[in-house]
Swiss-Prot record:
One Pfam family, short name: adh_short_C2
Localization annotation: Mitochondrion matrix
Modified-residue entries (Phosphoserine), positions: 176
Name of this chain's protein: Carbonyl reductase [NADPH] 2
EC number: 1.1.1.184
């Protein structure tokens, strides 16, 4: 989806791979100046080669203090995509404190922190903005082994609504994109069992999983003025799964 974001500055977390990486590339092509945030420096090096001029930031968003040091002075941002996430699979009864804490620190707490940093700057500058939280279909339905992960995404749904309510008076829109399994490295690991993948795909009326481009297009739409009256909402990129 071709949009024009010329003159705007965007920040994308989880920018090293998959949805985040392709979002950075799409925003770059569309004229935005992009701050790309990920914890893997090698991914930033290759991304900078693909998208000359982006601003790479290497930080583990699961670390509150490190995130504050890295992004506290990031400067003016008009568009924010909270995409960073980990999918740590463990049965509910076996879920460890380490897995629980890591899941919530990266998937939810970092969204809270980075959004605070960006929104405060938007308000101080007196400019409108758009924030998109990359959630998941499992914010509404879940599967065995995803207790921690799906809990973070369910909480993100309410965080998105709360942010939209409180930031709306400042002309800051907040929405989420909630995809089904996306054919990224993370998505392929979740469906590495062929039988599980077959059964899961059959529950989608369109008999397919999502491509990265499908999710990126929804993110771009929500970032753009084409969704100027949309806030506190979720777009489900799920091939009809919830309808079934």
């Amino acid at each position: 989806m071709q949009m024009n974001f010329s003159g705007l500055r965007a920040l994308v977390t989880g920018a090293g791979k998959g949805i985040g990486r392709d979002t950075v590339k799409a925003l770059h092509v569309s004229g935005a100046r992009v701050v790309a945030v990920t914890r893997t420096n090698g991914d930033l090096v290759s991304l900078s080669q693909e998208c000359p001029g982006i601003e790479p930031v290497c930080v583990d968003l699961g670390d509150w203090e490190a995130t504050e040091r890295a992004l506290g002075g990031v400067g003016p941002v008009d568009l924010l995509v909270n995409n960073a996430a980990v999918a740590l699979m463990q049965p509910f009864l076996d879920t460890t404190k380490e897995v629980f804490d890591r899941s919530f620190n990266v998937n939810l707490r970092s969204v809270f922190q980075v959004s605070q940093i960006v929104a405060r700057s938007m308000i101080e500058r007196g400019v409108p903005g758009s924030i998109v939280n990359v959630s998941s279909m499992v914010s509404h339905v879940t599967y065995p082994g995803l207790a921690a992960y799906s809990s973070t995404k369910g909480a993100m749904t309410m965080l998105t609504k709360s942010m939209a309510m409180e930031l709306g008076p400042h002309k800051i829109r907040v929405n989420s994109v909630n995809p089904t399994v996306v054919l990224t490295a993370m998505g392929r690991s979740v469906t590495s069992d062929p039988e599980l993948a077959r059964k899961l795909k059959e529950r989608h009326p369109m008999r397919k999983f999502a491509e990265v481009e499908d999710v990126v297009n929804s993110i771009l739409f929500l970032l753009s003025d084409r969704s100027a009256s949309t806030s506190g909402s979720s777009i489900f990129v799920d091939a009809g799964y919830l309808a079934s």
